[in-house]
């Protein structure tokens, strides 16, 4: 899992720290503070680099050793989503390995965890295993309820229900919009697209696990992000049917592509998925 100390240098081996957002996390007044969901995109080294001659393990194995469950519990935080990346469909060529979401009770609790001795002792494993990471602080975004959208269909009744060979998948969209200063405001072009896409996706069993507006990227590569959306489908085949729908494709070309300036879209297989209940 990917966390960090925002008070240190501007750059760590796996990304660049945004100190302005780190200061916001540390200084938000208690009356204005509240839960924050830290959304982690993780790319591992093939072999962990400890730098001390330690026997070689994979970057993923090093991250498993790092996972700071006890430190999280001590500050009231918990892992609400953990998934392996099955495929990166859209992006800049980075083949992400894992996506995780940690819910913190407050922004300040995120900072407090970084100072814990037990957390700092574990950090050596993350530093050794992580090649690149993006960590985005998000808050829940209202999901539009258009009156003309069809009701969600039970998975047992969709054309491509989950099977033993093709179970549920989560599709995550990490979005940067053109000229949007407020991540909570979805551009009008995107609103048109998402309404049309919902007409198709809901018939194939779409369940929205959570939409988040990005209030800051605490570790990354300098790019700003606006929204992160998690969509669950009963099977990969169900998602593919949505992708290939002609009407959805037409709306993508006319509206979605003009609204988005940068994105990652990934198919995930989750081992922990309490995301929807964590937002309620």
What are these regions (language model features)?
Residues 1-99, 105-112, 129-250, 261-280:
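Short S/T/G/P-rich N-terminal loop/turn motif that feeds into the first structured element of a domain
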Residues 118-124, 247-253:
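A common structural junction motif
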């Amino acid at each position: 899992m990917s966390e960090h100390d925002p008070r240190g240098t501007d750059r760590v081996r796996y990304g660049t720290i945004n100190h302005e957002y780190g200061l916001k996390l540390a200084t938000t007044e208690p009356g204005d503070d509240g839960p924050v969901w830290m959304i982690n995109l993780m790319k591992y080294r093939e072999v962990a680099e400890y730098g001390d001659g330690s026997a070689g393990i994979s970057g993923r194995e090093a991250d498993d050793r790092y996972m700071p469950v006890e430190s999280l519990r001590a500050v009231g935080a918990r892992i609400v989503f953990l998934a392996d990346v099955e495929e990166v469909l859209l992006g800049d060529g980075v083949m992400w390995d894992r996506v995780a979401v940690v819910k913190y009770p407050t922004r300040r609790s995120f900072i407090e965890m970084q100072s814990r001795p037990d957390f700092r002792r574990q950090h050596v494993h993350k530093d050794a295993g992580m090649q690149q990471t993006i960590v985005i602080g998000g808050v829940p975004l209202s999901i539009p309820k258009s009156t003309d959208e069809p009701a969600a269909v039970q998975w047992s009744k969709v054309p491509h229900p989950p099977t033993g060979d093709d179970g549920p998948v989560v599709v995550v969209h990490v979005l940067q919009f053109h000229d949007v200063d407020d991540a909570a405001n979805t551009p009008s072009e995107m609103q048109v697209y998402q309404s049309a896409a919902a007409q198709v996706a809901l018939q194939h069993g779409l369940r929205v696990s959570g939409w988040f507006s990005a209030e800051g990227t605490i570790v990354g590569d300098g790019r700003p992000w606006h929204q992160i959306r998690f969509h669950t489908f009963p099977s990969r085949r169900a998602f593919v049917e949505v992708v290939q729908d002609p009407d959805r494709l037409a709306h993508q070309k006319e509206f979605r592509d003009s609204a988005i300036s940068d994105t990652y879209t990934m198919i995930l297989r989750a081992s922990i998925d309490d995301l929807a209940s964590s937002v309620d």
